[in-house]
């Protein structure tokens, strides 16, 4: 495993802290964590690397109202480009 997902309850809901590297092989676990109806934000400050599939999953969840906190600039740019091309 090259990543870690920690869950932190807040008064607004659950915040997921993702650290390490997320790849296609990790998507099922990440998707399951994001499907928890109480997730309000994903903390990305410790995220080192993601692939395109993981970026798309984060973009979809952001579009559905989940906040991406401290999103690394390269991921933010990637999400923006992906949305603009759709």
Task: Enumerate the predicted regions with their spans.
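Short beta-strand/loop segment at the start of cytosolic alpha/beta domains
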Residues: 1-14
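Amphipathic alpha-helical interaction surfaces in cytosolic regulatory modules
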Residues: 15-86
């Amino acid at each position: 495993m090259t990543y870690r997902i920690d869950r932190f309850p807040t008064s607004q809901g659950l915040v997921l802290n993702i650290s390490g590297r997320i790849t296609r092989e990790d998507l099922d676990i990440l998707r399951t964590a994001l499907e928890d109806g109480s997730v309000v934000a994903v903390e990305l400050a410790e995220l080192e690397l993601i692939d395109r599939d993981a970026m798309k999953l984060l973009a979809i969840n952001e579009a559905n109202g989940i906040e991406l906190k401290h999103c690394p600039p390269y991921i933010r740019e990637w999400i923006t480009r992906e949305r603009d091309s759709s």
